């Protein structure tokens, strides 16, 4: 178990108070739910922060010693029938790193089929660690982060497309259709950007992203039964993505000599290669979803990091927040794999015919 001394507990709690104030915009007497998945010390720090903000706190522990395929019905029932004003899910996988990938499906279902369907502000922390809280991105200036995110979102309005290149070999264009909007986890206030009652974002905060999905009925080929599942709407992308830093669901830094290389045509994933056998589980997860539900994998998300306190750690929850980085995600049913691009150049093309370079070699130039 990761431990924290009393002085550090105060340090973390103070920052979580800022998060609740500036990002979730909570007030005294609001209700707050803490979901603790093997993160007792951070749950304690969050509980202290919530009480210091005058919130009414409830806590649910997810104690299973194996990965969840679906989270307990008592959690879903509480969220749907006694919806708190806000909450947080703390998922600490440092003792079982492989669970981060194997619980993705349950987390996707929780977020899109419960959290987004009720009026709640939800902080989502898959893979959170005490080190992030003490020494990393949770120690950011939340007021400044919210301001910066709003400014950058203004630069990402009325887009036609993005072009992303990087020294590692990434060269990809992404069309930004009218159905896709950019959002941020620096301000987690419902409703969602697409009008959903609830809104979620990560803690640690620190990105803007474009992503959209919908719940569809699809046949599970393994059981023959029809299921309601969240499936991403593709973003029309053409080109090559080279991930040479960090990949979602995998703990550890990627060997830049053996990167993940993904090829997209019209938004569909048409090829995925990697010489590092340690990363086979990522490819297997994508292939498993394709076979199980018979649907293609697509480019689901484009994200840009904003957090100056974030570091390269090999943990995607933190690494994708590094200021000046870019990440793109492959998505399918119960499958979401973020792939980080370091030191990108990003050029935006607007509908009025003008262009603007937003990032050059990993540095914002707005």
What are these regions (language model features)?
Residues 1-240, 248, 350, 355-366:
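Active-site bordering "gate/hinge" segments
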Residues 39, 94-96, 169, 179, ...:
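Short, glycine-/Ser/Thr-/acidic-enriched flexible segments
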Residues 149, 158-160, 224-228, 244-251, ...:
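Glycine-rich, charged/polar anion/phosphate-binding loops
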Residues 227-281:
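Oxyanion-binding "anion nests"
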């Amino acid at each position: 178990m990761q431990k924290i001394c009393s002085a550090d507990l105060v340090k973390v709690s103070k920052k979580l108070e800022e998060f609740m104030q500036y990002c979730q915009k909570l007030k005294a007497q609001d209700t707050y739910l803490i979901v603790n998945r093997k993160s007792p010390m951070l749950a304690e720090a969050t509980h202290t922060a919530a009480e210091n903000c005058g919130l009414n706190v409830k806590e649910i522990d997810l104690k299973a010693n194996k990965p969840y395929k679906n989270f307990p019905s008592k959690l879903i029932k509480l969220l749907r029938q006694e919806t708190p004003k806000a909450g947080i899910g703390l998922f600490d996988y440092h003792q079982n790193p492989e669970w981060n990938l194997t619980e993705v499906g349950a987390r996707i279902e929780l977020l899109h089929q419960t959290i987004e369907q009720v009026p709640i502000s939800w902080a989502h922390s898959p893979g959170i660690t005490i080190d992030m809280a003490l020494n990393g991105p949770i120690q950011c200036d939340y007021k400044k982060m919210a301001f910066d995110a709003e400014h950058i979102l203004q630069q990402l309005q009325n887009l036609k497309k993005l072009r992303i290149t990087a020294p590692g070999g990434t060269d990809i264009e992404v069309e930004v259709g009218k159905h896709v909007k950019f959002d941020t986890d620096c301000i987690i206030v419902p409703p969602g950007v697409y009008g959903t009652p609830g809104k979620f974002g990560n803690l640690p905060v620190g990105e803007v992203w474009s992503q959209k999905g919908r719940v569809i009925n699809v046949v599970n080929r393994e059981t023959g039964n029809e299921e309601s599942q969240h499936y991403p709407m593709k973003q029309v992308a053409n080109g090559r993505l080279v991930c040479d830093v960090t990949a979602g669901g995998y703990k550890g830094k990627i060997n830049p000599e053996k990167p993940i290389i993904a090829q997209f045509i019209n938004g569909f994933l048409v090829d995925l290669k990697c010489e590092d056998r340690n990363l086979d589980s990522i490819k297997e997860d994508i292939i498993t979803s394709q076979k199980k539900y018979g649907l293609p994998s697509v480019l689901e998300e484009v994200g840009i990091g904003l957090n100056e306190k974030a570091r390269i750690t090999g943990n995607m929850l933190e690494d994708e927040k590094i200021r000046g980085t870019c990440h793109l995600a492959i998505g399918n049913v119960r499958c979401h794999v973020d792939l980080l691009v370091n030191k990108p150049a990003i050029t935006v093309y607007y509908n009025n015919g003008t262009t603007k370079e937003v990032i050059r070699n990993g540095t914002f130039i707005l």
